[in-house]
Every structure is written in C-alpha cells, then in structure tokens.
Amino acid sequence: MSDDTIVIISADHGHKDIEKAYTLLDYPEILECLTMPASLESRALTFNVKENMRKEFEERFNKVFRDEFWLMTTEEFLSKNFLGFGDKHPKIDDFLGNYVALSTAGSIIRLETFLAEGKKVKKSTHCGLTPDEMEVPVIAITK
C-alpha cells in the first residue's frame, strides 16, 4: 500500500435483533383498510390504503403499533428525506403506496397474506430507526 492510500471500511446499515413479530392477519380491522397487502420490508412497510379509510387506518394502526412503529404519509416520509436528497424517481409514488411505517423498536410486522402464512422469522433484520441500525462503524487504515 502506498503512503498516500487510505482504506475505508464501513457498512450500509446495521442490524437489530427481532424482539417481537406481528402479522397483520391478526388485525382484520387494519386489513380492511388496505387495497393490497403491505409490502417492502418487515421494519419499513408501505401500505396502499383505501382513500375513504385513511383516517380509520391511521387510528387503527396507531392504536396497536404506536409505540413500535412510526406511521406517516408517503408525502411526510419523502419530505423527511429518508431516501436521500435529489430528484424523486418517477415511479416512487407507485412503489411506496400512500403510507409508510418505520420500526422504532425491536419489532417487525411479517409480510404475510392468507395465501402465504407462517413464514419463518429471521433472528435479526434492518430498515428500522433504532441506533443499532442507523449507526455503523467506520474504519480507516493508513500505512
């Protein structure tokens, strides 16, 4: 390694042990608000909510998950730059639906449907807002 070389080692995200796993199949009052199953990640979920049930969805979701997930509209999520800065991809509105929920604790919501129940739960995961996931080490090595 030459004298003017620096090697930097880091990670793109940390990991969080899963402490509690939920399934929306246990909450039909939330499911009835959706036009399709939740998607994306078990700690960063997107929801397509029926336009006439947005208020009910917010109330029902927050009643159950307020202490473990931060629910926000997609507009709020994007305005907080969770996906970074710069121009928005033209398909992002289709991809995200109209609500996003980010885990703030050690919990996940399994991405299950009645056709695909009982998926195995990993021991740890990422995509939440805990320090274990947001703070990563940076190692710099010089000669």
Regions found by a protein language model. Name each.
Residues 1-143:
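Feature captures the catalytic ectodomains and active-site-proximal regions of enzymes
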